[in-house]
A protein has these predicted regions:
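A conserved regulatory-domain signal marking ACT and ACT-like small-molecule sensing domains
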Residues: 1-143
């Protein structure tokens, strides 16, 4: 459906919810308001879709990234300084490389990547965005 209609999806995340009978799909896409409305209309036509909601820009959103960085002795202090500054975690450490976990909004993840490029990124993987509205209302309680 997405390819046929020309939607440009930036990220797609699927996971469990508080209700075992439902999964939540978070779609992050770029495009104009018309493309967004077309996507919403197409999703609402699908039988298995319970609810479609567009979240406000001030919603709570997070992304997870794992990134492997070259572990050169001359760069270790600077890398660890960046890890601390970004509240990241070193989750694996060898003589050749280290794997760092970073969680935050997408702009934080992007900034961390730019900071790590000079040290040598070996490999990286991003989860895509997960998001919730602020407050106590839920997606299903808004019906």
């Amino acid at each position: 459906m997405f390819t046929r209609r020309g939607f440009n999806i930036d990220a797609l995340t699927v996971g469990e919810t508080e209700s075992p009978e439902y999964s939540r799909i978070t779609i992050s896409l770029s495009g104009d308001g018309y493309a967004r409305e077309q996507l919403i209309n197409q999703l609402r036509k699908l039988i298995n879709v319970k609810k479609v909601e567009v979240l406000d820009d001030d919603c709570i959103k997070r992304e997870l990234m794992l990134v492997k960085i070259e572990n050169k002795p001359e760069n270790r202090a600077d890398i660890h300084f960046a890890v601390d500054a970004y509240r990241a975690k070193v989750i694996d450490y060898t003589n050749e490389g280290m794997c760092i976990e970073v969680t935050g909004d997408p702009s934080k993840i992007d900034a961390f990547i730019k900071l790590m490029i000079p040290f040598g990124i070996i490999e990286m993987c991003r989860t895509g965005i997960v998001a919730l509205d602020r407050g106590t209302s839920t997606l299903l309680s808004k019906e």
